[in-house]
């Protein structure tokens, strides 16, 4: 969905991306080189712009996109979509079918209530689930990028990143809306 009064929304529409959020991933990748050879997992893929970019950057691997909602992407080769909830065993089983992954990306956010305390708590739980799942499926030296809401227990998430990754960074890309309290945590080189 595009708000045409926004420069990133206009650019996304012009360039054929499904959402403006892609520019967050593009900026982070240009600074930190996330992609390498191997499979890529996109958790919370809807509406699909992260997957669009990841598919373009894919190097000798498969892109697996997961979401509870359908996404409007279909590629003939090296792409698999899983409609499911990452808290359910059946979905995790399907994700594991394609492991190991060299990169896990997630721009997922919980359904927001408008109550910042509730929203940050839900974001924390979702982020921790994504990290735990990533620890099971990442290739040694793999990378993880997760969106987190600030204002809760995000430092616990950051400490977990520090425990498992050689390089850890907190990032607020330029494309994040001014009034948003989202940031991204990047972990590079899993397994120290």
Swiss-Prot record:
Keyword vocabulary terms for this entry: Cytoplasm, Methyltransferase, rRNA processing, S-adenosyl-L-methionine, Transferase
Compartment list: Cytoplasm
Pfam families from the UniProt entry: FtsJ
Active-site residues, as the UniProt record annotates them: 147 (proton acceptor)
Recorded superkingdom: Bacteria
InterPro entries registered for this protein in UniProt: RNA_methyltr_RlmE, RNA_MeTrfase_FtsJ_dom, rRNA-MeTfrase_E, SAM-dependent_MTases_sf
Reactions that this protein is recorded to catalyse: uridine(2552) in 23S rRNA + S-adenosyl-L-methionine = 2'-O-methyluridine(2552) in 23S rRNA + S-adenosyl-L-homocysteine + H(+)
GO CC field: cytoplasm
Chain sites annotated for binding S-adenosyl-L-methionine: 48, 50, 67, 85, 107
Enzyme Commission code: 2.1.1.166
Top enzyme category: transferase
Major location category of this protein: cytoplasm
Example of a GO MF term: rRNA (uridine-2'-O-)-methyltransferase activity
Family (UniProt): Belongs to the class I-like SAM-binding methyltransferase superfamily. RNA methyltransferase RlmE family.
General function of this protein: Specifically methylates the uridine in position 2552 of 23S rRNA at the 2'-O position of the ribose in the fully assembled 50S ribosomal subunit.
HAMAP family membership: RNA_methyltr_E (MF_01547)
The protein's name in its UniProt record: Ribosomal RNA large subunit methyltransferase E
Lineage of origin: Bacteria, Pseudomonadati, Spirochaetota, Spirochaetia, Spirochaetales
